[in-house]
């Protein structure tokens, strides 16, 4: 087994994320990132993400969603204010399929937006809260979005995939 995965703590929760490009099996780290997990799961349960678009795709980097306005500048946390980053030393951006909070490059500014990694992104270490990962063969559903045609100025897909 790869040492990449040996360093990760065990996951303690699972959910199925329905998207227009296929389902994603996601396992969560609620012990390491309790605020991010609670926020994400509650938004899923409340239907906040239903029908929203993945507004940003960067080839071989990431897929971003979770903004109810679809613009990349909206959304709020379940507490209606930003919440703190939860950086854990055993959770690193060293493989594809990680689920993390998007924060506009400002510390402790997490709201509703999140992203999935499409490749290792070590330069993000200590900058974003990792709180889950895509598991099993559903990782291949996620990887199909890397080749979507996007607006080169905004990274917005010309035909944005959606959360269901």
Q: Which residue ranges define each predicted feature?
A:
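Cyclophilin-like peptidyl-prolyl cis-trans isomerases
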Residues: 1-164
